[in-house]
């Protein structure tokens, strides 16, 4: 078996929803893989990215009217077909129905999507009174070091920024819920993934505000390996 990140499920659910609601908008959060937008476009839907936090997504959907909303954290909202709240059992049954109707195994469905090598969501400790200032320091460095990237740092990013690269992306943001910053990155190639991993590790190590010994750290080994 293999681990399937929740944003891959967002892409599969988007494919399913767009079969029944062609041309509709699919909303997803900042941390999701590029596979989500690419899958939406290939199924003739309209991708709409918004800041992380399911409360922010639900509020924005009062305006956007997306047919489906998905988050990396595993919140899935089938706005056109259900009651506009996330329900794990419904999502599971919905996935099983999609696989049955398209006559695919889970592996076949995942393998049909665009391929990216993606990190887990990485959380690194940073005190609440320092994390906003840390992002203010990091942002100009990223713009300088990645002049070719599309930098998303407006209201879609909310509490951080996302760099869209030709063969990957990465996100760095401060948490709204605790004393830490979040990192997520990906690339189409192993070489590109390693380049981003090493860059992000050295970037964060250059700031004393980052607490590598914090009990709140999650998946830090994905950066340090």
Protein language model regions, located:
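A conserved helix-loop-strand patch within extracytoplasmic ligand-binding domains
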Residues: 12-20
């Amino acid at each position: 078996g293999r681990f399937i990140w929740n944003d891959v499920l967002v892409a599969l659910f988007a494919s399913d929803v767009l079969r029944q609601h062609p041309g509709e908008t699919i909303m997803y959060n900042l941390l999701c893989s590029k596979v989500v937008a690419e899958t939406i476009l290939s199924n003739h839907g309209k991708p709409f990215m918004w800041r992380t936090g399911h409360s922010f997504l639900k509020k924005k959907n009062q305006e956007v009217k997306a047919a489906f909303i998905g988050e990396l954290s595993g919140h899935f909202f089938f706005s056109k077909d259900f009651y506009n709240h996330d329900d794990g059992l419904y999502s599971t049954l919905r996935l099983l129905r999609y696989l049955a109707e398209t006559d695919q195994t889970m592996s076949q469905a995942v393998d049909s999507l665009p391929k990216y090598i993606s990190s887990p969501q990485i959380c690194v400790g940073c005190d609440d009174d320092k994390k906003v200032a840390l992002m203010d320091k990091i942002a100009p460095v990223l713009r300088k070091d990645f002049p070719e990237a599309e930098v998303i740092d407006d209201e879609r990013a909310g509490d951080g920024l996302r760099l869209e690269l030709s063969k990957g992306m990465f996100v760095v943001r401060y948490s709204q819920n605790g004393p830490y910053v979040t990192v997520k990155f990906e690339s189409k190639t192993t070489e590109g993934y390693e380049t981003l991993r090493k860059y992000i590790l050295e970037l964060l190590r250059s700031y004393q505000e980052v607490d590598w010994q914090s009990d709140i750290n999650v998946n830090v080994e994905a950066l340090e390996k």
